Amino acid sequence: MISKKLSWLVVGLVVLSLLVTGCQQLQPTPEAAEAPAAAGERLCDGVKIVFFPGGPPGGPFGTVVYNGAVAASADLGADMEVYWSDWNPEKMVSQFKEAVATNPDGIAIMGHPGDDAYETAVDEAEANGIIVTSQNTTLPRLEERYKGDGFGYVGQELYESGYMLGKEAVKRFGLQSGDRAMVWGLLSQPTRGLRTKGAIDALEEAGLTVDYIEIDSATDADATAGTPVFTGYVTSNPDVKLVVTDHGGLTATLETYLKAADKGPDDIYGIGFDLSPATLEAIRGGWTDLVLDQQPWLQGYLPIVQICLVKKYQFSGLHIDTGSGFAHADNVELLAPLVEQQIR
């Protein structure tokens, strides 16, 4: 019931946003505008959409994104097919090409591979009349090129989110110049890495010594695979005061990492991104101290809405920032019921 109410609230907010901002970019007027859906008919009935939740099936972040897409498809009547990608950029591009070959009405992609990797395939899709939009990680060049054809974005502003988390950690925990921090992130990915860079910049501006570790492909797909990396780092750097996990799956695994390194909940500050049932329990237990919530359920729901609105009414692409605020021990119980339902 909560999911249903949230779903219609989100649709209402999106439509209101369109009414307010629609004059900013006019679309060619269709020869005959479609009438609103008749009673019992849903907005997206018969519209075929391919959706990318990003990670492996059952992963803590991708599951919430998927839940949002499923809710939108049920509410609007879309016929949705899902491609799971294990957070592998090369796999995302390959699967996108496969999806284009099936000629759906629209495809909602994760932007991790970047503009260069996607460009040729997106150009082909757009030339064939397939609506393409993005979530979680921006594709600035492609979004600019095809915004008038419905290419939008739903997600956080990446650099700003990372910077905000790092800055808040310094302030909240009283970290000082010379303190050691470990950032475990994805700098190698062209746009996705901006969030990692934002966190590093904020910490270095405060004078912290930052050790960076790239998340390898095995850990990207299965966060528990990174346990030896974490324990090895902590053993070699016993003075580390802060660990930043720039990945929802790794953030959900912080308690496991710390216990494997024989650390208690008060020994190292642990911060990261995104809520999940495991992260909720880690916050309650003191293992995870600060999380930036980017509301991933919306990153599933709103791209489906985007494609439906473009298909039915030729609206242009919307750019929606889902980055919300911080979750920690003092406020997480307000969100706990929704986290447990994998909505927040």
Kindly give the residue locations of the regions a language model identified.
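Hydrophobic alpha-helical segments within soluble ligand-binding/sensing domains
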Residues: 43-44, 92, 152-179, 226-227, ...
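Hydrophobic alpha-helical
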Residues: 107-127, 199, 217-281
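Short, solvent-exposed amphipathic alpha-helices that sit
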Residues: 60-75, 161-165, 190-210, 225, ...
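Short, low-complexity disordered leader/linker segments with a strong preference
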Residues: 1-48, 74, 123-130, 343-344
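Extracytoplasmic "Venus flytrap"
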Residues: 39-72, 76, 81-98, 111-116, ...
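Short beta-strand elements in bilobed, periplasmic/extracellular small-molecule ligand-binding domains
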Residues: 73-86, 180-182, 203-223
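Hinge/cleft segment of the Venus flytrap/periplasmic-binding protein
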Residues: 30-47, 183-184, 202-206, 295-344
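Flexible loop/hinge segments that line or gate small-molecule binding clefts
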Residues: 115-116, 121-160, 276-284, 289, ...
